[in-house]
Amino acid sequence: MKENLERAVEIAKELERRKITNRLSYYEPYDYQKKFHNSNATQRLLMAGNRVGKSLSGAMEMAYHLTGKYPEWWEGRKFERPVRAWAGGVSNETTRDVCQKELVGQPDDPSAKGTGSVPLDLIGETVRKAGVPNALNSLVVRHITGGWSRLGFKAYEMGKEKWMGEQLDVVWLDEEPPASIYSQALTRTADKG
């Protein structure tokens, strides 16, 4: 009897761990989020009040593109191959505290890796950002095709020069950027239709 109870507790803990490290499979967007995700527009804006899930929506969509694991309800754009992407915010710290946290997990807790929108078992190599505690510069994510998607973290404060040069599939701008950064984001994805 005691062994059965201990085994049941172990199973419950493992199920909870799997749920926590695979948020992508459990995401149930509100109607306004689903409408945003299902738009096929090449440029989109999700404007809503504070603390209602805008950043979560951006992170979940980015995770779908990075992994190629789109839900059944998805009608938006799909990538059938690994992608190159950037996620950006106002500063290195806010990019870490919002974008990185929503995608990977709490930045200052190594045990939280994989508790963001990207499932733990699909996170590959991560590269730290120099000079910014607990911040990532980039990471790779296993795509369902077997290849690796690449995600870089950028900050508007870096200036437009740091946003130049790369050809990308997806750019997630978590807060309204300066016009020069927005222009660079458009240029990076210009040939992606």
Residue positions per predicted region:
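Phosphate/NTP-binding elements of NTP-utilizing enzymes
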Residues: 1-193
